[in-house]
């Protein structure tokens, strides 16, 4: 355990597995469909996928991007979401390992960092799902943003040694994020007499503020103004 870098491979695999599930969430959540039933199946022929058809990234490559039954072309976005989530997971674990200059892991032990990593991974995973749903349908589901707005201050108790974010700055970030986007929405409506953003944007910025703090909101505003 003196060289925990080997666990980056585990973090990559962990992310790929969840990336496969996120593909299901992205496809089913907006319509209110069950995330567990029916099992993963080919949208063209309807056949339920075999376990070996559902191995993240590798199955798509082995099947050359086709259904294992009817050989209908399967979108490359499925393995890309899995790969993206795997890379984010590995990067996030590397960030956790380097917390406090890399001394935190030697002070508390590797296993003690798994919990904070899981919290951060859940947040990052939610952002992945939101991003692709927004790309597809131009909506940001409240089913995802609201729970993360509410849990941000609670998560801060465990994440403070890693992120430096306290529960109070988390609350302030959520309020600031929501207030800023509300002012933008109201200002746009006042000038243009029509809506420019929806309530989803309001919730999204509040969610980011809740988990990343006020500094994140300032950075987003500066980046958006460029």
Walk through the language-model features, giving the residues of each.
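Functional transmembrane core segments of multi-pass inner-membrane proteins
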Residues: 102-107, 111-112, 117-226
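Membrane-interfacial, low-structure loops and terminal tails that flank and connect transmembrane helices
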Residues: 41-44, 66, 101-110
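Membrane-proximal soluble regions of multi-pass membrane proteins
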Residues: 22-77
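Hydrophobic alpha-helical transmembrane segments
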Residues: 1-17, 153-163
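Select subsegments of transmembrane alpha-helices in polytopic membrane proteins
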Residues: 76-84, 142-144
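N-terminal membrane topogenic signal
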Residues: 3-7, 73-78
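Membrane-embedded alpha-helical segments in integral membrane proteins
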Residues: 21, 84-105, 153-157
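Transmembrane alpha-helical segments of multi-pass membrane transport proteins and ion-pumping complexes
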Residues: 16, 20-24, 90, 174-182, ...
């Amino acid at each position: 355990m003196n060289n925990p870098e080997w666990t980056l491979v585990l973090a990559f695999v962990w992310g790929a597995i969840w990336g496969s599930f996120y593909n299901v969430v992205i496809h089913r959540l907006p319509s209110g469909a069950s995330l567990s039933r029916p099992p993963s199946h080919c949208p063209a022929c309807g056949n339920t996928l075999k376990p070996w058809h559902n191995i993240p990234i590798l199955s798509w490559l082995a099947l050359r991007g086709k259904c294992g039954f009817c050989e209908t072309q399967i979108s490359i976005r499925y393995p890309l979401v899995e790969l993206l989530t795997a890379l984010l997971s590995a990067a996030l674990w590397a960030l956790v390992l380097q917390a406090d200059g890399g001394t935190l892991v030697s002070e508390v032990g590797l296993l003690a960092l798994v919990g904070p990593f899981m919290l951060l991974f859940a947040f990052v995973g939610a952002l992945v799902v939101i991003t692709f749903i927004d790309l597809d349908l131009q909506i940001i589901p409240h089913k995802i943003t609201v729970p993360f707005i509410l849990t941000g201050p609670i998560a801060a108790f465990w994440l403070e040694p890693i992120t430096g974010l306290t529960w109070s700055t988390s609350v302030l970030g959520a309020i600031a994020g929501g207030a800023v986007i509300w002012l933008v929405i109201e200002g746009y409506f006042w000038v243009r007499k029509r809506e420019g953003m929806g309530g989803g944007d309001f919730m999204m910025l509040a969610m980011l503020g809740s988990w990343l703090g006020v500094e994140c909101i300032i950075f987003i505003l500066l980046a958006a103004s460029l």
